[in-house]
C-alpha cells in the first residue's frame, strides 16, 4: 500500500504551487477579472441607495436617466470579466493537470520493477487519471470561487460598513463562528476524499481484471464472481460519496442558519431609535440586500471547501508516489557495444518483502558468443536469473560481471541497450506491426531492415496476407494476432536490434511444431557470435546449447551439455524422459 503523508492543507498547496507558478500570468489576469466581476455585482447593489433616496424619494429624473446606462455597462463588464476569468483559470488548470500527469507518468517509468510487483495496474491508472483530475479542483473551480466570492464578501462588507457600521458589527461577531464551522467540516471532507480515492483505485482494478480476463470469465463462468466483486467496490464508492454529500448537506444549512441569525439581529438592531435616526430607505435596503447577497458567496465558499479538500487529498496521494525512490542508476560506465562475456559469482537474491531467497549461491559463466540454457520446473528461478542480468532487480550477495565489470557500474540505459529480450509474455502496442518491430527505434531503421527482420522471424508469411501488411494496426497487446504470430513479432524485434546479448525466455513456447522448427533456424543464426541465455520448457530447443544448467529451487544442481547430462541420468534426464515419454 502507498503511504500518504498527512500534510496540512497549506503544506500540500505550498508544494503544489511550483507546478502552478509558471502560469502565474494567467492567474493574475484571471484574478483581476474575478475581482472586476465581483465588483460589478457589489456596485450594482450600491445603486439601490441613490435610486431609492434620490431617484424616487426626491424625484430626481437625472438619476433615472443615467441609471439604465450604468446597469448595462456593469452587465457588459460582468460578462466580459466572467469569460476572461473562466478561460484563464481553465487554461492554467489544464496546464497543471498535464504537467502533473507527465511528471507522474515519467516518475512511474523510472520506478523499479519491484514497485509494479506490489501495485495493481488499476490503482496506478486511477492515480494518473482520476487523482490527477482531482487536482484541477484546487487550481480551477475552487480558485474561481475563492477569489470571486472572497472579493464579493470583502466588497459587500466594505459597503455595509460605509453605510451603517453599527449594523455591520453584528456580522463581525458572527464571522469567527462561521470560520470554525468551515474548519471542522474541512477535516471531515479530507478524510472521506482519501477513502474515495482508494476505493476508485479498487473500482478501476476490478474493471481492468474483468476486461483483460474476459475470455477466462466466460469460459469458467465467472460472471457472478466478477459481478459481485465489482458491485462490492462500487457500493463502497457510493457509500463514500454519500458521506461526502451528507457532510456537505449538513454544512450548507449550518452556515445559512448562522447567517440567518445575523440577519435577524440586524433587523432587531435597526428598530432601535438611535440607529433608525441614521438610516434612510435606501441605506437599510442596501445593507439588508448586502447581507442577503452574502449568503451566496458564503454558501459557495462552504461548497468549494469539499472540492478543494478533494484536490488536496489527491495531491497528497500523488506526492506520496513522487516521493518514492526511483530505480537506482549510479553507474558511470557507458559502452557502445560489449563483447558479451557474462559471469555470476556466488549470487544470492531475494525478492523485495520476501525472506526466503529465490536464488542461492548461483555461479555461472557465459563466454562471448556462447549459448547457455536454463531448464527446470516452473518457479525454480530461471526467469529470475534473466531479470538480474538486465538489472530489473539488484542482488543482495555476490557479483554479476559483464566483460569483467560489475553490472552495477554500467549506466542502466547503456546496459539494457546491449540486451535483446524475447519472453513468453509478449507485450505488443496498439500500433502498426512495423512500429512494434522497430519499437523505440523507428527513426533508426529503414523499412527494408524492418521487413528483413520480419522475414528472418518467419513473420512475413502472415503479414503479407493482411490488407495493410506491415502497416496493419494490431490492437491492444496484439489482440488481432494469434499467440504464435505475436511471438514472431517479438522475435523480429529482437532480430532488428542486433544486440550482443540475447535472452530468450520461453521464446518459442507459443509456436506450433512447424513454426517452431522454422523460427529455430532463425534463432540459431541469430545466436551466432552472440552471448545467449535461453530459458526453455521444450528441451528439444536447447539440445545444441554449449552448456545447460538445471535449476531446482533456486540452486544449480546440474551443468553440462545435452549428452553429458543425459549420460548422468540425473534431474535433466528425468525431465527429458517426462517430456518425450522415453
Curated annotation (Swiss-Prot):
Source taxon at top rank: Bacteria
Where's it found, cell-wise? Answer: Cell inner membrane
Q: What's a Pfam family this protein contains?
A: ABC_membrane
Q: Which residues cross the membrane?
A: 16-36, 63-83, 153-173, 253-273, 275-295
Classification via InterPro entries: AAA+_ATPase (IPR003593), ABC1_TM_dom (IPR011527), ABC1_TM_sf (IPR036640), ABC_transporter-like_ATP-bd (IPR003439), ABC_transporter-like_CS (IPR017871), ABC_transpr_lipidA (IPR011917), P-loop_NTPase (IPR027417), Type_1_exporter (IPR039421)
Alphabetical UniProt keywords: ATP-binding, Cell inner membrane, Cell membrane, Lipid transport, Membrane, Nucleotide-binding, Translocase, Transmembrane, Transmembrane helix, Transport
Q: Where is the ABC transmembrane type-1 domain?
A: 28-310
Q: Which residues bind ATP?
A: 376-383
**Where does this chain mainly localize?**
membrane
Give the membrane topology, semicolon-separated if more than one: Multi-pass membrane protein
Annotated disulfide bonds: none
Q: Which reaction does it catalyse?
A: ATP + H2O + lipid A-core oligosaccharideSide 1 = ADP + phosphate + lipid A-core oligosaccharideSide 2
Q: Where do the ABC transporter domain residues begin and end?
A: 342-578
Annotated SUPFAM superfamilies: ABC transporter transmembrane region, P-loop containing nucleoside triphosphate hydrolases
- Tell me yes or no: is Membrane among this UniProt entry's keywords: yes
What's the Enzyme Commission number for this chain? Answer: 7.5.2.6
Q: Which GO terms describe its cellular component?
A: plasma membrane
- Select a single GO molecular function from the record's annotations and give it: ATPase-coupled lipid transmembrane transporter activity
* Enzyme class name: translocase
Outline what the protein does. Answer: Involved in lipopolysaccharide (LPS) biosynthesis. Translocates lipid A-core from the inner to the outer leaflet of the inner membrane. Transmembrane domains (TMD) form a pore in the inner membrane and the ATP-binding domain (NBD) is responsible for energy generation.
Tell me which family the UniProt entry assigns to this protein: Belongs to the ABC transporter superfamily. Lipid exporter (TC 3.A.1.106) family.
Subunit composition? Answer: Homodimer.
Q: What is known of its domains?
A: In MsbA the ATP-binding domain (NBD) and the transmembrane domain (TMD) are fused.
Q: What is this protein called?
A: ATP-dependent lipid A-core flippase
Amino acid at each position: 500500500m502507498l503511504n500518504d503523508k498527512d500534510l496540512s492543507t497549506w503544506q500540500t498547496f505550498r508544494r503544489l504551487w511550483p507546478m502552478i507558478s509558471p502560469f502565474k500570468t494567467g492567474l493574475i489576469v484571471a484574478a483581476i477579472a474575478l475581482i472586476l466581476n465581483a465588483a460589478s455585482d457589489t456596485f450594482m447593489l450600491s445603486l439601490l441607495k441613490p435610486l431609492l433616496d434620490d431617484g424616487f424619494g426626491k424625484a430626481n429624473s437625472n438619476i433615472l436617466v443615467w441609471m439604465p446606462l450604468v446597469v448595462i455597462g456593469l452587465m457588459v463588464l460582468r460578462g466580459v470579466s466572467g469569460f476572461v476569468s473562466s478561460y484563464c483559470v481553465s487554461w492554467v488548470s489544464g496546464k497543471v493537470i498535464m504537467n502533473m500527469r507527465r511528471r507522474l507518468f515519467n516518475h512511474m517509468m523510472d520506478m523499479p520493477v519491484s514497485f509494479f510487483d506490489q501495485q495493481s495496474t488499476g490503482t496506478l491508472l486511477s492515480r494518473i487519471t482520476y487523482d490527477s483530475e482531482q487536482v484541477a479542483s484546487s487550481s480551477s473551480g475552487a480558485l474561481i470561487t475563492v477569489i470571486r466570492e472572497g472579493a464579493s464578501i470583502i466588497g459587500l462588507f466594505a459597503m455595509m460598513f460605509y453605510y451603517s457600521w453599527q449594523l455591520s458589527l453584528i456580522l463581525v461577531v458572527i464571522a469567527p463562528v462561521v470560520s470554525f464551522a468551515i474548519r471542522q467540516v474541512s477535516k471531515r471532507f479530507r478524510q472521506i476524499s482519501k477513502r474515495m480515492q482508494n476505493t476508485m483505485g479498487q473500482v478501476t482494478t476490478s474493471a481492468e481484471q474483468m476486461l483483460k480476463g474476459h475470455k477466462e470469465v466466460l469460459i469458467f463462468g465467472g460472471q457472478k464472481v466478477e459481478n459481485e466483486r465489482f458491485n462490492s467496490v462500487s457500493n463502497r464508492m457510493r457509500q463514500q460519496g454519500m458521506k461526502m454529500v451528507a457532510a456537505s448537506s449538513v454544512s450548507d444549512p449550518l452556515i445559512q442558519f448562522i447567517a440567518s441569525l445575523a440577519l435577524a439581529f440586524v433587523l432587531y438592531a435597526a428598530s432601535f431609535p438611535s440607529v433608525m435616526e441614521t438610516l434612510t430607505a435606501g441605506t437599510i435596503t442596501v445593507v439588508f440586500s448586502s447581507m442577503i447577497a452574502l449568503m451566496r458567496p458564503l454558501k459557495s465558499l462552504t461548497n468549494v471547501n469539499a472540492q478543494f479538500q478533494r484536490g488536496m487529498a489527491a495531491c497528497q496521494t500523488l506526492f506520496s508516489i513522487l516521493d518514492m525512490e526511483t530505480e537506482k542508476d549510479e553507474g558511470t560506465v557507458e559502452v557502445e557495444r560489449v563483447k558479451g562475456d557474462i559471469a555470476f559469482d556466488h549470487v544470492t537474491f531475494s525478492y523485495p518483502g520476501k525472506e526466503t531467497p529465490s536464488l542461492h549461491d548461483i555461479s555461472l559463466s557465459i563466454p562471448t558468443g556462447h549459448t547457455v540454457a536454463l531448464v527446470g520446473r516452473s518457479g525454480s528461478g530461471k526467469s529470475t536469473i534473466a531479470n538480474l542480468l538486465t538489472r530489473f532487480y539488484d542482488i543482495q550477495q555476490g557479483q554479476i560481471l559483464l566483460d569483467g565489470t560489475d553490472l552495477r557500474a554500467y549506466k542502466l540505459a547503456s546496459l539494457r541497450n546491449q540486451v535483446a529480450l524475447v519472453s513468453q509474455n509478449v507485450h505488443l502496442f496498439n500500433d502498426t506491426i512495423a512500429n512494434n518491430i522497430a519499437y523505440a527505434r523507428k527513426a533508426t531503421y529503414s523499412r527494408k531492415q524492418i521487413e528483413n527482420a520480419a522475414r528472418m522471424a518467419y513473420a512475413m508469411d502472415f503479414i503479407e496476407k493482411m490488407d495493410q501488411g506491415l502497416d496493419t494496426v494490431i490492437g491492444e497487446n496484439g489482440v488481432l494476432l494469434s499467440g504464435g504470430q505475436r511471438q514472431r513479432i517479438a522475435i523480429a524485434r529482437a532480430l532488428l536490434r542486433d544486440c550482443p546479448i540475447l535472452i530468450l525466455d520461453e521464446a518459442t513456447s507459443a509456436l506450433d511444431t512447424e513454426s517452431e522448427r522454422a523460427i529455430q533456424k532463425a534463432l540459431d543464426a541469430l545466436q551466432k557470435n552472440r552471448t545467449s541465455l535461453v530459458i526453455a520448457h521444450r528441451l528439444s530447443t536447447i539440445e545444441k546449447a554449449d552448456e545447460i544448467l538445471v535449476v531446482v529451487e533456486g540452486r544449480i544442481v546440474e551443468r553440462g551439455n545435452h549428452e553429458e547430462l543425459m549420460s548422468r541420468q540425473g534431474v535433466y534426464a528425468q525431465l527429458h524422459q517426462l517430456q518425450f515419454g522415453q
